[in-house]
């Protein structure tokens, strides 16, 4: 049966059509906003998956090139693996939905969001986030809390709801807010050093705007939502829970109060082995239940410690940051490096500078763009002392890399100010919480060490949260470590400078965050950020004045746009010849700006002269040292600039009368000639005679 519903959001129609397609899916629907259309399909397995201790939710964000009228490039001519942007959007959809499923739900759930049509003014990822929530609400899957998502911009201090492409380009804020009718579920922001009070107001603006979409989803649920199935939820057997708690709770409590991480982990392994041996005969096939009970006991102890005793596992105050150390210039042959250590979390970031032509070209569903600043994040297994196969970057690594990249985007100098492509790579050497924010700090150190003139240093911090079961009590903590992240309710990451916020990412494991919690986290994060910046500036207080000896130098020359073809030459012949002869790298912009990159100044200067000679015009009245290229009975052809020849008529070869051209010059001779005129057909007429007369005149004056 076909169902249709629409509402008005920010002056544009939000429409939902359900029941027309995907008849075999649990729920299939089309959701549109303007001319942007996303198809959402959700399905769940009939029974829980056996042998797992997590909720197997799978979110897929599929981009289709036909949505923007493109045919995929490459030999295959079809979409391949998900792009980094697709992965980031899928993660953003997952984060607000996952906490709202019933605890203990182990059925496989898959949400597939397929982008079918894109109008650049209306972001498909925002639409997909709303569609995913709505499709789950309309299905019989046990998901009953609608989540709405909006985009918020800020232009001249005024907030804009779901900004258009033109508005996004003007905006100093790119904020995504996901919320239920009561609380904020997820935040993602990139900003141009926005003050804390303005960011808090923007989040509040987004939360209020979400309420219309929540009401829209609730209306759809009432009108044509399916009746929800009663799920089979996982819970350890009561007798196992009782026996393990009686046997081990006091021991686990004692262990969790040990502040030294290594000793605590050793004692935990010992007690787990004791528990396993104690119940091996009584519960031989219930190892998963026993592990779940032990985990629950650990969690209970840590949460009570924080919420009721106001004590942290490592003994710190709630607003206290772990010991920090910073170092730079660690790797001799790299262009810049920085090492940031906070407690047992340690990240080394390395900077590489390259030509503008090395910028990454992004040809997705949006407007084609190039990215000259990149940040990549690697999280190897040794960072947590584990042994795992080394493979390509996973979704988490891509997400953390993008967050740290976003934090520094507003601080990177313009192409005109610093004509380089910049790549940062953060290597996580040790992980005990908040490695993405340590990457922000490491990136700042590495950029300044490389001599990149960033506007200001940036730092990042992760805030945590512990709440009571009814959410009536909450405690916000600064600089969360592994245990607090693992057993806590929130990971609230804030990056920025002394001036303001540049990036935010918020995940929660509970049914949302209160306004008080958000305000407290943002304000406390500022205090922490300023403290960290002091430590970083003590290590290196400004970008180095000189680039590394091993970094290439960039030189710029401007040419007329109509000379670009001349510089490139047929099939790139001319520019490739310059590159081969000098060993430089050359990039040409459409406006006539030419970038020359070389580690050797002499090579760069030779290339610049060759480019200048190729592209500058021959001027009447100028004297040139030219080379004779051809001799005829009426004169000699002389190349005055590369590829530019003129004729010296026989009558203009010498002061005295010339009978034969060969009596005066030969092919290959270099002679001084003056440009007398350029005719309507562009032919250049030269005179050696005028130069000789001028020389005679000068000699007479000197005498």
Swiss-Prot record:
Mg(2+) binds at residues 485, 491. Residues 552-611 form the KH domain. It is found in: Cytoplasm. Pfam families: KH_1, PNPase, RNase_PH, RNase_PH_C, S1. SUPFAM superfamilies: Eukaryotic type KH-domain (KH-domain type I), Nucleic acid-binding proteins, Polynucleotide phosphorylase/guanosine pentaphosphate synthase (PNPase/GPSI), domain 3, Ribonuclease PH domain 2-like, Ribosomal protein S5 domain 2-like. It catalyses: RNA(n+1) + phosphate = RNA(n) + a ribonucleoside 5'-diphosphate. Its EC number is 2.7.7.8. GO terms for biological process: mRNA catabolic process; RNA processing. One of its GO terms (molecular function) is polyribonucleotide nucleotidyltransferase activity. GO terms for cellular component: cytosol. InterPro entries: ExoRNase_PH_dom1, ExoRNase_PH_dom2, ExoRNase_PH_dom2_sf, KH_dom, KH_dom_type_1, KH_dom_type_1_sf, NA-bd_OB-fold, PNPase. Its cofactor is Mg(2+). SMART domains: KH (SM00322), S1 (SM00316). Residues 621-689 form the S1 motif domain. Its main location: cytoplasm. The keyword Transferase applies. Involved in mRNA degradation. Catalyzes the phosphorolysis of single-stranded polyribonucleotides processively in the 3'- to 5'-direction. Belongs to the polyribonucleotide nucleotidyltransferase family. This is Polyribonucleotide nucleotidyltransferase. It comes from Clostridium acetobutylicum (strain ATCC 824 / DSM 792 / JCM 1419 / IAM 19013 / LMG 5710 / NBRC 13948 / NRRL B-527 / VKM B-1787 / 2291 / W).
